Amino acid sequence: MEPVDALKQAIKANDAAAVALALEAHPGLTSRLDEPAPGAAFGQTALLAAVQQTNREMVDVLLRAGANINQKSHWWAGGFHVLDDAWRAPWMASFLIGRGAIPEIHHAVRLEMFEDVRRMLSGNPGLVHARGGDGQLPLHFAQTVTMADFLLDRGADVNARDVDHESTAAQWMVRERPDVARRLMKRGAVTDILMASALSDVDIVTRILDADPAAIRMAVNKTWFPMQDPRAGGSIYIWTLGANKTAPAIAKELGHADVVRVLMDRASAGMRLALACERGDEDLVRQLLAARPAVAATLTADERRRLADAAQDNNTAAVRLMLEAGWPVDARGQHDATPLHWAAYHGNAEMARVLLQHQAPVNVKGDEYNGTPLGWARHGSEHGWHRKTGDYAATIEVLVAAGARGEE
C-alpha cells in the first residue's frame, strides 16, 4: 500500500491513532498534508476530511504533523475552509478558532457571529461581495432573516449567483431556510414557479402562470437551468428541490395543497398523467386514461422526456406505468440518454426488463457520449450513483440476452 493510501484509509476509518501511525511510518507525508488528498472530492485536504468527521483527536494529530488549519480546498469554484464545516457540531467553531482558524465573513455569517460580521463590514464594506466556498457570497450563508436584511442593507446583491451552481441565495435556501428565502423574494429576488411552489406562494404562482402558461412545464434539468460554465455542477435546485422535479411535484411533496390545486387546474392532461405515474398512483392513472384514452398521442416534448427522467431517478414503478400508458420507449432526457441507458447505468435489471418488453432499442446510441446501454452499464458499475447497490451483473445479462453488442 502506498503511504498516501494508508493515510487516506485511516482518515476514512475515522481512526486518529491510525492516522498518527501512518504519519510516523511515512514522515514524507507531512510535507503533503496541504495538498489535495488523493481521491477526495473538491480538492479536499486531509485536515478538511478530518473536520468533516468531527474528530477532534484526528484534527489535532494532523495539526501537530504540520497541517495548515487555514489551508482551503483546491477547488476551482472557490475553496472550502475548515470553518465551512464548523456547523456540524456545537463545539467545532470554538475548537477550530482556538487552534488558529481565522474566520472569514462567510463563516461569521453562517455561524451567526453578528458582531464579527458588523466589524468586518465596517472595516471593509466590499466584503459583502466576497466569494467563499463554491464561489458563494455572504448572503448565500445567511441563516436568519435578520442576517439577510443586515447584508442587503449593506449592499449585498439579492440576485448574485455562486460560481459552481450559478444559483442565487434564495435558490440555495428554498427548502431548508424558507423564511429567509421568502424575505429575499420580498426584497427583489428573481423568482420562478418552482421557488414559488416550494414556498407555497399561491399569488406568485398564479401571476407567473397568467403571464406565461408554459411556465408550468419548468423542471429541474439542464434545459430549464443551463450552466454558462461547463465546469459548473448544475443548478443548486438539483440538491434543494430534486433533479427533474416540476412545480406540481414539489408542491405535492411539501404538502402545499392550495398550490397543487392551482397548478393542476392549469396542467395539461399529459402532465397530470405523468405526475400520477411518478407518484405510483395506479388508481389515478387508470382514471385519467379512462377519461382520455389517447392522451399519450398528445404529449409535448417536455412530457415525453418525463419517462427518461423517471428512469434517471431510478423510479421503476413510474417507468412501468408510463409505458403502460403509451409513452414512447425511446424518449430522451439528460445527456440525450434513453430510459434504457439510465436503467443500465443504475444497474436496475428490473427496469431494463420492463423497457425491453416494450421494445426499447437495445443497441441505441446518439447520447452525448455516443454509448450503448451496455456501455453505460459497464461504466455505471464502476462510477455510477448506485454502483454499490445496483445489480450490474443481472442488468448486463438482460441486455446481452436481448442482443446487446459490445462497444465498437
Ranges and model annotations:
Residues 1-39, 111-131, 200-216, 272, ...:
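N-terminal segments that cap or nucleate solenoid repeat domains
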Residues 3, 43, 76-79, 135, ...:
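Start-of-repeat signature of ankyrin repeats
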Residues 9-14, 49-55, 82-90, 107-113, ...:
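Ankyrin repeat A-helix N-terminal signature
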Residues 18, 57-58, 91-92, 116, ...:
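Conserved ankyrin/ankyrin-like repeat signature
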Residues 34, 40, 73-76, 132, ...:
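Ankyrin repeat boundary/linker residues
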Residues 1-6, 90-111, 119, 178-199, ...:
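Ankyrin-repeat-protein effector appendages
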Residues 23-29, 61-68, 98-101, 121-126, ...:
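Ankyrin repeat domain, specifically the short helix-to-loop turn at the C-terminus of the second helix
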Residues 30-31, 37, 70, 128-129, ...:
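Ankyrin-repeat junction/capping positions
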